[in-house]
Amino acid sequence: MAQRLPVLYNKKPCYDIVFQQSFDGLWEELAELGAADKRLCIVTDSTVDGLYAAQILKFLEGKCRKAVKYVFPAGEEHKNLDTVRDVYRFLIEEGFDRKDMLLALGGGVCGDLTGFVAATYLRGIDFVQIPTTLLAQADSSIGGKTGVDFDSYKNMVGAFKMPRLVYMNLSVLKTLEERQFYSGFAEVMKSALIKDAPFYEWLIENMYEICERDLNTLEEMVIRTCSIKKIVVEKDPTEQGDRALLNLGHTIGHAIEKYKNFELYHGECVALGTVAAAYISWKKEMLSMEEFYEIRDMFVPFYLPISVDDIDPQEILKLTKSDKKMEAGTIKFILLKKIGKAVIDRTVTDEEILAAIEEINFSEEDAHE
């Protein structure tokens, strides 16, 4: 039987996160949303298309008014307004109206882009998240943040749009490419660090089972991660306060991601950004030295970087200034008071940021000397 997490919006039921180990229950969930009387469009990328789109289209055949798919080229570089325009055009040509529905089948890029289309097409159309990466299941598919990149600004154009459903087939994690899998773990780790010290300890205790991708262990891990995010976004759905805590590692992480022209995965950059944030927390005497090194080294068994070559600290600093989390010219930095407790800090100086960037700006061999 599927496990479910109901998510509230303004203290009222909004949507369910459904955890399954196959796609077999998807139509039943869609039918509950009135999908039989709707046109459905699967929006997916060129990588995920060949893996799951045909299977899901087969489930939909003959059960709804119309089932089509739109495939865009895979990669962060295609998460932009040009792709959004192409999806708009496709939906218009296929006759989609405000009563129809989009299905975001893929990772974080697909969910962000599809959600933004759903928020803006005809002033709003329903959409469902079907995340197929650990990063999307653990983080980006939940909470209603949607958006695309604009020039050098990541997620600069966006909207809050809650999905009608988040359907997670956890079995896809078994076959996920290794680097993609571990990239997603950075968001799992982030969730534990900001809100749940016992979960952090659980991750350490279950390290082997996670790396072996034991399905029951992965299910518990994803459910616990989603539970943390659910609590945070229910209290602060539009990021006016504590929802910003979910941005641990993202200020410097986004800057590195852009500087490296998206050669590094998002989760890899979040890991680097989290190490940098933990370093600043140590230097501000929030964390002990031992806690900093423990956090840093926790990423290593999960094949996540704790240092990066060939970055210009001044350029990274400059890119942090274009971060959308700036407020009145000040960066809202997320720091750690201890493992399991994060805080918003507006006092981080350029010198502290540069020192943190220097800390991660060397070879991994040097990091263990």
Model-derived features: positions:
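A glycine/threonine-rich phosphate-anchoring loop and its flanking beta-alpha core
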Residues: 10, 116-209
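Short glycine/serine/threonine-rich phosphate/pyrophosphate-binding segments
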Residues: 109-116, 137, 255
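ATP/NTP phosphate-donor binding region
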Residues: 1-101
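Solvent-exposed alpha-helices and their adjacent loops that cap or buttress functional pockets
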Residues: 10, 34, 95-97, 120-121, ...
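C-terminal charged capping/lid subdomain of soluble metabolic enzymes
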Residues: 3-4, 188, 286-369
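Non-catalytic interfacial helical region
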Residues: 88-105, 114-129
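Active-site segments that bind and position negatively charged phosphate/pyrophosphate groups
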Residues: 201, 206-314
